[in-house]
Amino acid sequence: MCGITAIFNIHDGAQALRKQALLMSKRIRHRGPDWSGIYQGKTAILAHERLSIVDPASGGQPLVSPDGKLILCVNGEIYNHQELRERLKGDYEFQTGSDCEVILALYKKKGIDFIEDLNGIFAFALYDEEKEVYLIARDPIGVIPLYIGYDDKGHLMVSSELKGLEGFATHYEPFLPGHYFYSEDRKLTRWYTRDWMDYANVKDNPTDVQQLHDALEAAVKRQLMSDVPYGVLLSGGLDSSITSAIAKKYAAKRIETNGKADAWWPQLHSFAIGLKDAPDLIAARKVADAIGTVHHEIHYTIQEGLDALRDVIYHIETYDVTTVRASTPMYLLARVIRSMGIKMVLSGEGADEVFGGYLYFHKAPNAQAFHEETLRKLSKLYLYDCLRANKSLCAWGVEGRVPFLDKEFLDVAMRLNPVAKMCPGTTIEKKILREAFSDSLPKEIAWRQKEQFSDGVGYGWIDTLKKITSESVTDEEMANAAKRFPINPPQNKEEYYYRSIFEEHFPSESAARSVPSIPSVACSTAEALAWDSAFKNMNEPSGRAIKDVHESAY
C-alpha cells in the first residue's frame, strides 16, 4: 500500500506548490515508508509515498512511460498484471516489474477506456504531459481510499487520506468508488456497473456452490502476489478462517510462476488479537491448529485500547462508532505485524456485505429486500469497513488485501439467487458460504455464529467504551450536540466523544461531511430499520443488539 497526492490545473507558482505537495505527501508518509518520489510538470505535480510489495528494487513511483510523456502515481495492486503484460507485448516497452505499470501501457493503447480491464484495488492519478490532460480513478468498491478537493485558485487536488487535503483545499470530499475523473470532461464518470445491481437480473438465477468455492479460491490465490513476506488476519470467524485456509493451501509456491517455483517465504503466519480469553482468540487457535499456520496471538488490555483511541481516529479519519470500535484492536495488531517484517496481510472484509452476514439480515422480509440491502452495504463499504481494512493497517505500513471484494469473485457471488443467501428465523447466516468450505475448516468454526470484529475481540471492549464515553459526555453537552456539531450532530454519547477527538484533528466542514452518521442496528443501513419494529427505538451497531438471534444478546 502506498500514498499518493497530486495538484492539477497549475498555471503559475509551481515552485511554491511543489513545497505544498511535499507537505501534503509528508502527512501520509506512514502509508509508504519505503521511499518518496515527486514529479513536477508544467501544469501538474504528482507525489508518491511507497510501500514496496511487488518489484521492490525498480518499481518506484511516479512511474514514467518510455517516451517520458505519461506520468503515473498509484496506490494499489493490479492482480491481473501478468496477463495484461502478456496481452500488451509489442505495444509498450515496460520499464519496471511493477504491477501498476500496465496502467500506463493500457492508457497509451486505449485512452481512458481501459479501467474495466483492471482487476485489483487501486486509486491512481495519471498525467499526460503532451496533451496536458489528467485522469484520476478509484477501484470498484473503494478498498483504496482517495479524496478530491479544490482550493480558491482553481487547483484540483487529490490525496489518499483527507489529512493530505485538510488546510490546503477549501473544499474536499471522498472520491467515489468505481468512478473516474477526466480533465477534458471536468466531471466524475461511473465506470463500474454490473447487471447484478438490479434484482430483476438475479432473482431467477441458479445457485452453484462449487462455482462459488472455486471463484473465492481463485481470488485468494491471485491476491497472494507478493515479493515480500505476507500473512493472514485470522479472527477465528468464518470469513477470515476461509481466506486463511485457502492461503495456506497455496503459500508453499510462488503464484507468480504458476506454482512452479518454491515460495520465498513458504511458511504462512496468522495473526489474531483480543482481550484475554476473547471469543475470537479461542476460535482462531482452533483454526490455526487445523490448517497449520504459524500463529501469533496478541493480547491487549482495555486501557491500551483507550490510550490508542486518539491516534486511531487520526489515522482512520472517521467518528463512526462501529468503525472506531473495530479499528482500535486492528491498529494495535498492525504494529506487531510490521515489527515482524510482514508488509501484507489478507483479511475477510466484505463477506458480510456480499452474503448478508450481519445478524439483522435474519429479519429481511423477502429476497428482493435482502439483495437490495447487500447492494446498499457494498456501495457504502468505502465509508466503513474499508477504512478499517486499509487505514488502520497503513498507519504502520502494512497492506491489507480483501479477496471477498475481488472483482471477478463479486461477479459470481452477487449473481447467486438471493434466496440461497437468506437466513430466515434461526437459519444460520451465510449458510451457502459455510457449505462451500465446510470441508476446509473444523466443524465448530464452519458453523460458528457471526461475531462482529469489535465484539469478537472481547465483549468487555465495547462495554467499557460505552461506559467511559457515557461518563465523559454530560447530558447537557448531548442536549446541545446540534449546536456544537451542526453537521451530522452526534446521535449518542459515544459518537459525541469520538466526534470531539475527530474535530481536534480535522476541524473543517469538509472533514465533518466526509463521515456518515445514520441510525443503525447491528451495522444495518437506515433503510433496513423498517424490517423489525424493535429496531425503530434502537441505535446500536453491535450484533448483540439483535435479540432472539445473537447467542449473547443484550
Spans of features found by a protein language model:
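Short, basic, helix/turn surface patches
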Residues: A125, V321-L333, L375-L378, V473-A479
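Short, hydrophobic alpha-helix immediately C-terminal to the catalytic nucleophile
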Residues: L104-A105, S241-K248, Y331-R335, G356, ...
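Short acidic/histidine-rich active-site segments
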Residues: I342-D352, Y358
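Cysteine-centered catalytic environments shared across enzyme families
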Residues: M1-Y319
